[in-house]
């Protein structure tokens, strides 16, 4: 779903463990790493989209996690000009994201990157909460920084 400003409505997921680490996933057959994220379909709430993406991308269900927090506002990033698909309509210029902080309740052996026909990720690891800000692709860094600042107290108090 793309809004009137050309932003695709999207959810992002920060999954933390009991040690204050966050799940960091490598995109399938690529060198880039990121948090799980995905689009909101027409008729879906952000929470419904988050649970769908959680299963599609890392194989977890609602019973495997607990929602600790949701960002107060939507965060946006623009795609670099060379990544915009100019011939595809409606035109998507970037993402408008609502972020969820989830606590993993199950064992991390339940994480499964191969639950969908099309894999988003091929591997994952636990990392310190600030690591992703320095490692994510440059045009997402400002969003990651804002999200982590909003979630930091909840992550380190686990």
From Swiss-Prot:
GO terms for MF: mRNA 5'-diphosphatase activity
Record keyword Membrane present: no
GO cellular component: cytoplasm
Its EC number(s): 3.6.1.-
Disulfide bridge positions per record: none
Biological processes, Gene Ontology terms: mRNA catabolic process
Motif Nudix box, chain ranges: 38-59
CDD domains noted in UniProt: NUDIX_Ap4A_hydrolase_plant_like
Keywords: Hydrolase
Domain Nudix hydrolase: 6-149
One Pfam family hit: NUDIX
Cofactor(s) annotated in UniProt: a divalent metal cation
PANTHER family in the record: M7GPPPN-MRNA HYDROLASE (PTHR23114:SF17)
Function text: Accelerates the degradation of transcripts by removing pyrophosphate from the 5'-end of triphosphorylated RNA, leading to a more labile monophosphorylated state that can stimulate subsequent ribonuclease cleavage.
Family: Belongs to the Nudix hydrolase family. RppH subfamily.
Designated name of the protein: RNA pyrophosphohydrolase
Provenance organism: Blochmanniella floridana
Organism ancestry: Bacteria, Pseudomonadati, Pseudomonadota, Gammaproteobacteria, Enterobacterales
């Amino acid at each position: 779903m793309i809004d009137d400003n050309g932003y695709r409505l999207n959810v992002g997921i920060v999954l933390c463990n009991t040690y204050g680490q966050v799940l960091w996933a490598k995109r399938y057959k690529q060198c880039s790493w990121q948090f799980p994220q995905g689009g909101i379909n027409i008729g879906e709430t952000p929470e419904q989209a988050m649970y769908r993406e959680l299963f599609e991308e890392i194989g977890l269900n609602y019973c495997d996690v607990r929602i600790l927090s949701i960002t107060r506002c939507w965060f946006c990033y623009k795609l670099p000009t060379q990544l915009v698909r100019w011939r595809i309509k409606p035109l998507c210029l970037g993402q408008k994201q609502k972020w969820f902080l989830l606590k993993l309740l199950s064992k991390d052996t339940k994480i499964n990157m191969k639950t969908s026909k099309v894999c988003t990720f091929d591997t994952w690891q636990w990392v310190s909460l600030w690591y992703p800000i320095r490692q994510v692709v440059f045009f997402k860094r400002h969003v990651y920084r804002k999200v982590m600042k909003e979630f930091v107290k909840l992550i380190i108090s686990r």
